[in-house]
Curated annotation (Swiss-Prot):
E.C. designation(s): 5.6.2.1
Protein's name in the database: DNA topoisomerase 1
Interaction with DNA as annotated region, ranges: 163-168
Subunit (UniProt): Monomer.
GO BP field: DNA topological change
Similarity field: Belongs to the type IA topoisomerase family.
Annotated gene: topA
SMART domains the UniProt entry points to: TOP1Ac, TOP1Bc, TOPRIM
One GO location term (cellular component): chromosome
């Protein structure tokens, strides 16, 4: 029997760590939190100094029993949950359940799950940091007080199943505020004039800049005509040449927030998926002969700090691969995390390259690991050097300007370019070699009419970035927050951008009127600052809770008395129930919209909303092929005559037969490419656009 018991959150983490520690250590998983506030009631005694009433989470009884059994037999119990506030709270709850001594140095933390890091952490165990535990407790209790007080009011006055929360309500507000900006936006006309110029055999473009040596706004066609009328022939002169060398520094290695943003832009990952895959990479990957190793550092961090060891290893790799000129000469300026002294998200070893790891990883794991690895290595590389040139092209009172740039030294851009840098302004644009006094010929002067555009709706990446910039919540809460506002049907995604629903706007208006603090950005930011102060030991958690709740409970009482009941009418489905003849209506469920009988609860008939794709079923030739959704919300295609006909296809039938085998053809999508393939043989053809 092992003398030492080590408790971690997950079986994957337990499996990895046990291999490093040897036979004297038994490592088991708590499967996440074991204690929490009860779901069936508030669980916070507001009359007794906000004392929380923790209970064992339903279903965790057998886990707790197993933990107690092993703890009783062990000489030492070590709590090795994650190195953040959440992990500290899990360790504290475990110590309470297992009745461990408060002063016992039994807490071990490591930022990466590698043999050296884990073994080193066990040489330096410490006591549980109660300030971190209290900060997490305060957040949990705050969220419970808000959710369990506002939600019942919304159920009673608006609709059952609704919720509000400190972070989700602000996120919803951002989406709605942006939608209102778009609705209220009034487009304004403006014009541009672009000229195509020739010098010897080279052609290049330039934009109109000045009239009579001053900026001249082209608001109307009349303004444009004034400029074109002033032109005299096609000859222009180069009146100024400005050459500069520009340095582009690489982006910092990833924090939780920037990882979520970049994975959304480059990999099309939702925030939740990014965190799930990152967790797998952190907890350990089986590298066969090398054993199980955590490939990245802890993925919940807001720090860009890098350890000296990691920097040295990256420098060695860059020198060997690209040469010493590609290594960074900059002094570190990494941002220390607001919450804890973590490192940035980086590979646990630069020498484990994505290509070397590919055979051990799933497709998603490989893509995310490659992103993290390249971003980190690039952050340790030399800046790129760009040569820029600006040409002023003049005729009389009219001046055009051409801007060009070439890459003199690629530096970090050899390996990685941040998505937001993939813009036209950062790409090469070569101009002919011209000097002041040279003559060029205008081959085309092209005016173009434009209208100002409203601000774009939020993508998931932009919403995450805005929440972080405003300091709303923690990066680790963004994924569940975005999930919640979608599951509650407060927002929907259209072309990968968030649009508020009618229900979302109704809920927002009620929260805005009766609980203004909850959606106030400044209030939410101040609350995060107070939570940080609790973690630093500068203020007690009970004082923070009391400062909030004393005024909040008055808002709840006012809402219960004054909020008017709102009737949300169901959308007619346009057909009658085949069971009782009542009109069918559109309802929103967990997996999207469906049809239900308006005579509910007397009639409980429901049916899926199906969309015909205009193709006859290739199996029965009687029904139509319709689009359906699986329980996991994945689109598939079936026959409208189901269950009489059981035709099903994940790919979209196109209504034509294969010229080789006469089976039906389907549209097959892989990434950004679409092609037509046979459902039976190897026939392929390009998809028609």
């Amino acid at each position: 029997m092992a003398d030492n018991l080590v408790i971690v959150e997950s079986p994957a983490k337990a499996k990895t760590i046990e291999k490093y520690l040897g036979k004297k250590y038994k490592v088991i998983a708590s499967m996440g939190h074991v204690r929490d506030l009860p779901r069936s009631q508030m669980g916070v005694d507001t009359e007794d100094n906000y004392e929380p009433k923790y209970i064992t989470i339903r279903g965790k009884g057998p886990v707790v029993k197993e933990l107690k059994k092993h703890a009783k037999k062990a000489k030492n119990v070590f709590l090795a949950s994650d190195p953040d506030r959440e992990g500290e709270a899990i360790a504290w709850h475990l110590s309470k359940i297992l009745e461990l001594e408060d002063s016992k140095e039994n807490r071990v933390v490591f930022n990466e799950i590698t043999k050296d890091a884990v073994k080193e952490s066990f040489k330096n165990p410490r006591e549980i940091e109660m300030n971190l535990v209290d900060a997490q407790q305060a957040r949990r209790i705050l969220d419970r007080l808000v959710g369990y007080n506002i939600s019942p009011v919304l159920w009673k006055k608006v609709k059952k199943g609704l919720s509000a929360g400190r972070v989700q309500s602000v996120a919803l507000r951002l989406v709605i505020d942006r939608e209102n900006e778009i609705r209220n936006f009034k487009p304004e006309e403006y014009w541009t004039i672009e000229g195509e110029f020739r010098y010897k055999k080279s052609k290049f473009n330039a934009k109109f800049l000045h009239y009579k040596n001053k900026p001249f706004k082209l608001k109307t066609k009349k303004d444009v005509e004034k400029i074109t009328a002033a032109l005299d022939g096609d000859q222009f002169e180069i009146t100024n040449v400005t050459k500069k060398e520009k340095t582009r520094n690489p982006a910092n290695p990833f924090t939780t927030s920037t990882l979520q943003q970049e994975a959304a832009r480059k990999l099309n990952f939702k925030a939740r998926k990014t965190m799930m895959v990152a967790q797998q990479l952190y907890e350990g990957i089986d590298l066969k002969k090398q054993g199980t190793i955590g490939l990245i550092t802890y993925m919940r961090t807001d720090s860009t700090r890098i350890s000296d060891t990691a920097k040295a290893e990256a420098k060695q790799y860059i020198t060997d691969k690209y040469g010493e000129s590609y290594t960074s000469k900059r002094k570190a300026s990494g941002k220390q995390g607001d919450q804890d002294a973590h490192e940035a998200i980086r590979p646990s070893s630069t020498m484990r390259t994505p290509d070397d790891m590919k055979s051990f990883l799933t497709k998603d794991q490989y893509r995310l690991y490659k992103l993290i690895w390249e971003r980190f290595v690039a952050s340790q590389m030399a800046p790129a050097i760009l040569d820029t040139v600006s040409l002023d092209i003049t005729q009389g009172d009219i001046k055009f300007r051409a801007n060009g740039q070439t890459i003199k030294f690629k530096g970090f851009m050899t390996l990685y370019v941040e998505t937001k840098d993939d813009s036209d302004s950062e790409k090469e644009n070569k101009l002919p070699k011209l000097e002041q006094g040279d003559k060029v010929t205008a081959t085309q002067i092209e005016p173009a009419q434009h209208y100002t555009q409203p601000p774009p709706r939020y993508t998931e990446a932009r919403l995450v970035k805005t929440l972080e910039e405003l300091k709303i919540g923690r990066p680790s809460t963004y994924a569940p927050t975005i999930d919640t506002i979608q599951k509650r049907n407060y927002v929907k995604l259209e072309s990968k951008r968030f649009v508020p629903t009618e229900l979302g706007e109704i809920v927002h208006e009620q929260v805005k009127e009766y609980f203004p603090e909850i959606i106030d950005v400044e209030f939410t930011v101040n609350m995060e600052t107070l939570l940080d102060k609790i973690a630093e030991g500068d203020i007690t958690w009970r004082k923070v809770i009391d400062g909030f709740f004393s005024s909040f409970k008055q808002d709840v009482e006012r809402a219960e008395e004054e909020m008017e009941k709102i009737e949300i009418k169901d959308e007619p489905a346009g057909e009658d129930c085949e069971v009782c003849g009542s009109p069918m209506v559109i309802k929103m469920g967990r997996y999207g919209k469906f049809m239900a009988c308006s005579n509910f609860p007397d009639c409980r008939n429901t049916k899926a909303i199906v969309k015909s794709i205009g193709v006859k079923c290739p199996k029965c030739n009687d029904g139509d092929v319709v689009e359906r959704k699986s329980k996991k919300n994945r689109v598939f295609y079936g026959c409208s005559k189901y269950p009489e006909c059981d035709f099903i296809s994940w790919d979209k039938p196109i209504g034509r037969d294969c010229p080789k085998c006469n089976q039906y053809l389907v549209e097959n999508k892989k990434g950004k490419t679409t092609q037509v393939i046979c459902s039976n043989c190897d026939y392929k053809e390009a998809a028609q656009k």
